Amino acid sequence: MIRLVRELYQYRGLLISLVQRELKARYRGSFLGFLWTFLNPTLHMLVYVLLFTVVMRQNIPNFPFFMFVGLLPWIWFSTSVGGGASAISDRRDLLTKVRFPAQVLPTSVVVTNLCNFVLSLPLMLVLGMAYGQWPTWHVVLFPVVVLIQLTFTLALTYILAAINVTFRDLQHIVSNLLTLWFFATPVLYPLSTIQDESARSLMLALNPMVSLMTSYQAIFYEHRLPDAEPLMALAAVSVVLLWAASSIFESRREEFAESI
């Protein structure tokens, strides 16, 4: 893990260059360009608002804002994991022609989507203020939650990217699992809607994204401190998972260029 972090720092210029390149290329040639950073989550929100408030008649106060608070970090997570799984196998040109630090590829995917997440935050804050929900001092813990999500997302992405080099079906499996994972995470509904306390505890234990989503909702929607115990447990698990992911990555590093 130390070697991986050291090499990421050593090749930080390359990482920044890849992130900038991806951000510029993502909407190049489109008429609206950079505006899609805001339009994508907004269109997602409108579809779910229509479904849950008109069709299913959910009665959650300020539902569009509630959903947006969870939707933005979920989009960051899902696009990072979905795109990161194939980050190495899709860049055979780089790995076979030059001595290239493979860990930069999945990292650049995660960081690129993190940038999109951060750029979308003003839209979320404006939406909240439109509903009379102004940010409170609890936002000081927002960077902590983001750091925990970043650690967990990087760990999962490294593992998937390493495995996908030899098992290409994984990227398609991940894409479908993310859809199921989304509905098993309280993004479109509060965790409190699950009446059974044992079921809620099981969700917190088995689904790492639950504590992240409820933490964002606590900070921006409920204006309170996140529940410390599940969040700190996830932080510890994420660090251990990142260590394991870096070990897997190191053990397979030499195989990447040969396998793809």
Curated annotation (Swiss-Prot):
It comes from Myxococcus xanthus. Belongs to the ABC-2 integral membrane protein family. GO terms for biological process: lipopolysaccharide transport; polysaccharide transport. It is a multi-pass membrane protein. Keywords: Cell inner membrane, Cell membrane, Membrane, Polysaccharide transport, Sugar transport, Transmembrane, Transmembrane helix, Transport. PROSITE patterns: ABC_TM2. It is found in: Cell inner membrane. This is O-antigen export system permease protein RfbA. Its main location: membrane. It comes from the Bacteria. May form an ATP-driven O-antigen export apparatus, in association with RfbB. One of its GO terms (molecular function) is ABC-type transporter activity. One of its GO terms (cellular component) is plasma membrane. Residues 32-252 form the ABC transmembrane type-2 domain. The chain crosses the membrane at residues 31-51, 63-83, 109-129, 139-159, 173-193, 201-221, 229-249.
